[in-house]
Amino acid sequence: MRVKATLINFKSKLSKSCNRFVSLFRFRVKRPVFIRPLRARHGNVKPRHQHHHSKKPICSCLCFLNSSKNHKMSNAKHRSSSFSVNDDDYSKFMQSPLTPATAKKLFTSPITTPYSSRTRKSLNARDTFEDNAVEDACRSFENYLIHLIVEEGKIDDLMDIEELLFCWKNLKSPVFIELVSRFYGELCRDLFSGE
């Protein structure tokens, strides 16, 4: 019984001290706050009471600061750089995001251009050589299949090929299509190349 009384006494002291602490942070509202006006309004529903505040909202001050900042930036002189830009180009550049096309025009380097074109040409030549080798190997494979079907008449191989073609038509993911194409291209090149 005595433990219960002590516990109740401790609880009341704790709650009083917490209430005092919370009262420091409590603020009083002049008008009651209702949840209904805070909810999102649908369509043309207008609030019942429109309160006009005598003070300006903070948003109008922030908008003013933002517009003056843009005005200052447009009037400011730009730094000198290795490329020349007209004033209208500079204002367009400042007001619109930098697209890759404009970045390429503005920041092209004469040193890297020939090197990049040479590497691009060598990569394209290598790709066309590999593509031609794969196409030749695939043509040899097709000729082999035609020879197999016509002369030997093996129906089991024909059914396997039809199943393979059916699975190929049902592939949807570009990653798998690329993987299967590369695998069969290399297989055809290894087995049926003319070398």
Curated annotation (Swiss-Prot):
GO terms for cellular component: nucleus. Disulfide bonds: none annotated. It is found in: Nucleus. The keyword Metal-binding does not apply. GO terms for biological process: negative regulation of DNA-templated transcription. InterPro entries: OFP17, Ovate_C. The keyword Transcription regulation applies. Residues 130-190 form the OVATE domain. Keywords: Nucleus, Repressor, Transcription, Transcription regulation. Transcriptional repressor that may regulate multiple aspects of plant growth and development through the regulation of BEL1-LIKE (BLH) and KNOX TALE (KNAT) homeodomain transcription factors. Plants over-expressing OFP17 have no visible phenotype. This is Transcription repressor OFP17. It comes from Arabidopsis thaliana. The lineage of its organism: Eukaryota, Viridiplantae, Streptophyta, Embryophyta, Tracheophyta.
